[in-house]
Amino acid sequence: SEGGHPEDSINCIVMAPTRELAQQIDQQMEGFSYFMPVSSVAVYGGNDGVLFEQQKRGLTLGADVVIATPGRLIAHLSLGYVDLSRVSYFILDEADRMLDMGFYDDIMQIVKFLPKERQTIMFSATMPAKIQQLAQNILHNPAEVKLAVSKPAEKIVQAAYICLSLIHI
């Protein structure tokens, strides 16, 4: 694969607290990577055995990006066929929500499978003590970026333009 990363290994893990968010991230990933040689697999719970087998196949073949919920990724890890030793990027989306849902121990269990040398990114709307504790445990020399809302959402104008001709004058 490009960038020196082996094709049969997982390069990036994006953790999401819910199946719905994992599906949404996966859909966006498919859109972003449409014209690029980037593969992704979404790994989330459900009662579908076929889905579990599809996820297993994606994990064992090696996807560039794995989008996963903590519980389902641990289920696959516990079966012993998932290799996370070459993960370069570990991303926690909505980390505060994951902790609110009781996933702290699951996240720490997943981290044990990851290489020490990796980039970890944590997104959180809030920074309560438990998020700060998680950050201390899994981040090394972190940089904190705080974003303030610059405009109320209702003041943002969204527009779509339709080009009636491909000829530029």
Predicted regions span which residues?
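SF2 DExD/H RNA helicase N-terminal ATP-binding lobe
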Residues: 1-166
